[in-house]
């Protein structure tokens, strides 16, 4: 890494609050070189609508100078159609995907150390004919990763997910010994790489009520989750036996852990978001780079109103800088 962490930020869905929270965050100081990938005219118009006194500059294909609050360096990717805040336009879906692809290329070219993503509208991207499940899956595919892990973080808690954006009925079949071992390996390795934790303590939740109640409420803990945990222990990974999820977040095992591994999206994230929604950060583990994101969606009804909080974006930028600095040690 250079003297300053180098961050590229994708501006997200142009009709949503992505531009709002990015511009709001960049009014704050950060010890980093920061560039935004988006439509510079959309960003300028949004700044005017929000009453922000910002200076924009177009970037050549190299890293920007150290960040100065109120100054925004932009890699310009034009929208195909005019943007109306709060109103989705399928014609601009390709613009959103192109901003992501541009960020990937900048990272692959080693011009940046990390990417921070503003929210996108998955539905309008798919309505345009482009297949898009989410940022996590997109970056995994673009970097050719066999597996990645979604991790959400706030001041008091880290929650990783064994499965991500799946219908609930598909979750049990998606959890295998091999998939859990892969997730545990990634969590163990990246908490060391990005956070400097030499022996991360992982609190692993069960899938079923009361962690299966000895097989009476489901056998996944006996047949899949416990064997995966035992193999992980043999590999030197510090992981608990399956913990009943209903009381897990009050247990000493979780309180003493560095990270919780939840079995599915809505098992672990409601607790984390209840503790710090709007200031939490989404991180993709298992990538050869660093990717962080906000913990909220596009909030179309808030676009250009001045009511969208930039706190999660500021936290995502701060987290990316810290991870980049830890990785360079």
Describe the role of every protein-language-model region:
Residues 1-135, 174, 178-263, 267-282, ...:
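Contiguous, glycine/small-aliphatic-enriched amphipathic segments in soluble metabolic enzymes
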Residues 138, 150, 159-161, 291:
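Conserved hydrophobic/aromatic beta-strand scaffold that supports enzyme active sites
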Residues 152-182:
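Ligand-binding beta-strand-loop-alpha-helix segment within the catalytic cores
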Residues 140-153:
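FAD-binding core/adjacent interface of flavoenzyme oxidoreductases
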């Amino acid at each position: 890494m250079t003297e300053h962490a180098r961050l590229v930020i994708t501006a997200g869905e142009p009709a949503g609050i992505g531009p709002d929270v990015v511009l709001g965050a960049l009014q704050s100081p950060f010890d980093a070189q920061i560039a935004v990938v988006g439509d510079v005219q959309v960003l300028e118009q949004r700044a005017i609508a929000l009453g922000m006194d910002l200076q924009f500059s177009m970037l050549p294909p190299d890293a920007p100078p150290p960040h100065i609050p109120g100054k925004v360096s932009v890699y310009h990717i034009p929208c195909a159609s005019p943007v109306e805040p709060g109103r989705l336009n399928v014609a601009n879906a390709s613009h959103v995907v192109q901003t992501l692809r541009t960020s990937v290329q900048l990272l692959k070219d080693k011009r940046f150390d990390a990417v921070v993503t503003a929210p996108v509208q998955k539905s309008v991207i798919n309505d345009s004919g482009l297949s898009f499940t989410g940022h996590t899956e997109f970056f995994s595919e673009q970097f050719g990763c066999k597996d990645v892990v979604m991790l959400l973080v706030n001041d008091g808690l880290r929650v990783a997910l064994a499965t991500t954006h799946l219908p609930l009925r598909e979750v049990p079949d998606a959890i295998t010994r091999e998939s859990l071992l892969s997730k545990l390996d990634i969590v163990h390795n990246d908490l060391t790489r990005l956070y400097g934790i030499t022996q991360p303590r992982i609190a692993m939740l069960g899938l079923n009520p009361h962690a299966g109640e000895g097989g009476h409420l489901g056998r996944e803990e006996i047949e899949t989750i416990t064997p995966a945990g035992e193999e992980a222990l043999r590999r030197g990974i510090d992981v608990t036996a399956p913990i009943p999820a209903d009381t897990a977040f009050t247990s000493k095992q979780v309180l003493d852990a560095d990270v919780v591994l939840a079995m599915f999206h809505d098992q672990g994230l409601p607790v984390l978001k209840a503790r710090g929604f709007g200031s939490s950060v989404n991180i993709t583990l298992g990538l050869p780079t660093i990717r962080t994101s906000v913990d909220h969606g596009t909030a179309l009804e808030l676009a250009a109103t001045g009511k969208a909080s930039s706190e999660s974006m500021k936290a995502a930028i701060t987290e990316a800088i810290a991870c980049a600095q830890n990785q360079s040690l």
